[in-house]
């Protein structure tokens, strides 16, 4: 009997963790966008007017819980909780719930960035949060939850990143480190996440996951409610979990400890794709992209060119500040069948602490758009760049197909098919790509969705005529505005 019960428990745990890798996308949609620091009312409108019609699968939103108010309102104040009240500069609980409902209604899922590792860092005196709640972080007193000093690990600093104890029980950049093994802390975290599930979210991005013991997270995840069927989720659906674990391959706390609990952010993907498209590694080597590069298995990897943290760091990572290379890297990211894809939607920044666009009263302002739909008032909105949202459509069109017909010039010109549904070519050399290539597509004329669109039966940009053998003449000039060309069956004239 004991053996049967143990087997049943292990089977249930395994099925729960497997279910936590399912992002619950509608239809053939399969790309998440991070609308970093957007207001809830603006996200709701964006779901209805742009994301839904363009085939985006979901939105990662900024932290929803009350946070400390920091001078100048830097973006990172959102990562310093004061309570679990749903009031931030993005809006209140009513506005959040309205956004979730409206986005779900048009097939766009919501994933919340959640802070389970810590509360706010030190603050002189009494800190006031975005919902008006008072706290004394230096005393580890957070009455809005409530938490007291006994709910935290003893104060210590991380000085040795190879020391598991320090990484998981000391304070990350001075943030008060919660004790997730405590029954009270677990209950408050589960209560917070369950409230968001009741409001209709599809899952969570777990910030600083590597700073929490995997067994504590496993307990918390397995204790969560199923997703709310009133928002279109099937019965017994589990929340999608993706966890921030920075692992460059030599970490004491490894991504492998978390990959079975949910997806894991594959930071090596971001670094290596930046290296390649900056010219530090020939694109020809991308043929074995994915697990061939030592990355996580595809279904366990949350992939991205950049995120809100590493776009602010020096190094190989590409961001909107290198637009030509960034668009090529994003096209490859969305065309190559590896990982659970997320694209970034940023605001402009000059330094690490730049706040989101705000008015004189430090209220976040709504994005404004020009006649082409691009953002103009401090919001970058990469997801509205034609070269990026067109590749979201490409990714939808080729879903469930594999790479075929890989071609390269032995250097930085590459091309490949996705079954017989799509074709991508990239030129990162300083000379033209001019070649008859096998597109694997049925005969006909196709619009290049990078340089233009299919409108009223004609292409506004380049077009490629494919013959009966699937071949077409591909030209990407070294000085073309974009170094990439993409064709797919839904853009056939």
UniProtKB/Swiss-Prot annotation:
Gene Ontology MF terms in the entry: 4-alpha-glucanotransferase activity; alpha-amylase activity; metal ion binding
The entry marks the following residues as binding Ca(2+), namely 117, 168, 177, 211
State the CDD domains in the record: AmyAc_bac_euk_AmyA (cd11317)
A GO CC annotation recorded here is: extracellular region
Quickly give the catalysed reaction: Endohydrolysis of (1->4)-alpha-D-glucosidic linkages in polysaccharides containing three or more (1->4)-alpha-linked D-glucose units
Where on the tree of life does the source sit, at the highest rank? Eukaryota
Modified positions (Pyrrolidone carboxylic acid) are 20
According to the record, the signal peptide region is: 1-19
Q: Which InterPro entries match?
A: A-amylase/branching_C (IPR006048), A-amylase_C (IPR031319), Alpha_amylase (IPR006046), Glyco_hydro_13_cat_dom (IPR006047), Glyco_hydro_b (IPR013780), Glycoside_hydrolase_SF (IPR017853)
Q: Please, one GO biological process term?
A: carbohydrate metabolic process
Q: Secreted as a keyword?
A: yes
* UniProt-listed Pfam families: Alpha-amylase (PF00128), Alpha-amylase_C (PF02806)
Principal localisation: secreted
Q: Which protein, by its recorded name, is this?
A: Alpha-amylase-related protein
Gene symbol of the encoding locus: Amyrel
């Amino acid at each position: 009997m004991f053996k049967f019960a143990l087997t049943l428990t292990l089977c249930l745990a395994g099925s729960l963790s497997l279910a936590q890798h399912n992002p619950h996308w509608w239809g053939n949609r399969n790309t998440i966008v991070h609308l970093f620091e957007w207001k809830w009312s603006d996200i709701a409108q964006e779901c209805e007017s742009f994301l839904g019609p363009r085939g985006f699968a979901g939105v990662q939103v900024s932290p929803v819980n009350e946070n400390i108010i920091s001078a100048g309102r830097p973006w990172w104040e959102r990562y310093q909780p004061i309570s679990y009240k749903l009031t931030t500069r993005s809006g209140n609980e009513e506005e959040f719930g309205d956004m979730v409902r409206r986005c779900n209604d048009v097939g766009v899922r919501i994933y919340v960035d959640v802070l389970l590792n810590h509360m706010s860092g030190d603050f002189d005196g009494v800190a006031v949060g975005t919902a008006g709640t008072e706290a004394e972080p230096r005393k580890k007193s957070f009455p809005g939850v409530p938490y007291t000093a006994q709910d935290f690990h003893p104060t210590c600093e991380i000085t040795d990143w190879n020391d598991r104890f320090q990484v998981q029980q000391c304070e990350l950049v001075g943030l008060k480190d919660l004790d997730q093994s405590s029954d009270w802390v677990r209950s408050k975290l589960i209560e917070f996440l369950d409230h968001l599930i009741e409001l209709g979210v599809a899952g969570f991005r777990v910030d600083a996951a590597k700073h929490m013991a995997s067994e504590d997270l496993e307990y918390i995840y397995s204790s969560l409610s199923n997703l709310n069927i009133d928002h279109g989720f099937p019965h017994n659906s589990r929340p999608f979990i993706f966890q921030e674990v920075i692992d460059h391959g030599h970490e004491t706390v490894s991504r492998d400890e978390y990959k079975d609990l949910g997806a894991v952010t594959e930071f090596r993907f971001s670094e290596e794709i930046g290296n390649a498209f900056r010219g530090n590694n020939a694109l020809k080597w991308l043929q074995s992209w994915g697990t061939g590069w030592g990355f996580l298995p595809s279904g366990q990897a949350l992939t991205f060119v950049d995120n809100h943290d590493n776009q602010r760091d020096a190094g190989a990572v590409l961001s909107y500040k290198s637009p030509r290379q960034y668009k090529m890297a994003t096209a490859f990211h969305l065309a190559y069948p590896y990982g659970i894809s997320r694209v970034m939607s940023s605001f402009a920044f000059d330094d690490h602490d730049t706040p989101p666009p705000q008015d004189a009263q430090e209220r976040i302002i709504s994005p404004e758009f020009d006649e082409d739909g691009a953002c103009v008032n401090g919001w970058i909105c990469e997801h509205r760049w034609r070269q990026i949202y067109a590749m979201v459509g490409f990714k939808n069109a080729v879903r469930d197909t594999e790479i075929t017909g890989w071609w390269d010039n032995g250097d930085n010109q590459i091309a490949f098919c996705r079954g017989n549904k799509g074709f991508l070519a990239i030129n990162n050399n300083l000379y033209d790509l001019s070649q008859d290539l096998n597109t694997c597509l049925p005969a006909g004329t196709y619009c290049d969705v990078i340089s233009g669109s299919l409108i009223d039966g004609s292409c506004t940009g380049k077009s490629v005529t494919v013959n009966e053998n699937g071949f077409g003449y591909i030209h990407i000039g070294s000085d073309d505005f974009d170094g990439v060309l993409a064709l797919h069956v839904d853009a056939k004239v």
